[in-house]
Swiss-Prot record:
Lineage: Bacteria, Pseudomonadati, Pseudomonadota, Alphaproteobacteria, Acetobacterales
UniProt cross-references to Pfam families, sorted A to Z: CowN (PF20543)
Identification of the protein by name: N(2)-fixation sustaining protein CowN
Gene: cowN
Biological processes annotated in GO: nitrogen fixation
Keyword Iron: no
Keyword Nucleotide-binding: no
Keywords: Nitrogen fixation
Function, as annotated: Is required to sustain N(2)-dependent growth in the presence of low levels of carbon monoxide (CO). Probably acts by protecting the N(2) fixation ability of the nitrogenase complex, which is inactivated in the presence of CO.
Membership in a protein family: Belongs to the CowN family.
Length: 91
């Protein structure tokens, strides 16, 4: 029997760190090849968040609507799907 995941009780068995790292890895080509000023801003905010002791899950959460809109515009279904999965399980 598969153990049920209840994000409101615990992140146990959710593997949020791995999932978050996967989303950032999928975002990397957008960081590297984009002319959009958003990506530079996003990465600067990530550095600030890390300096404040916040993790990448929080960074994604802070920019969730914008990220989803951009990924839709870029037709990046794979990254959008992983981001939405992370949203459902962990945010």
């Amino acid at each position: 029997m598969t153990e049920q995941i209840d994000r409101y009780v615990s992140f146990r068995n959710v593997e949020w760190e791995r999932r978050t790292a996967e989303v950032f890895a999928l975002l990397q080509p957008h960081f590297d090849g984009s002319t959009s000023p958003f990506w530079d801003y996003f990465l600067r905010q990530r550095v600030i968040a890390h300096a404040q002791g916040l993790d990448d899950l929080r960074v994604l959460h802070n920019f969730l609507p914008t990220l989803k809109d951009l990924l839709e515009e870029l037709d990046d279904e794979r990254t959008l799907s992983r981001l939405e999965e992370l949203e459902v399980l962990c945010m």
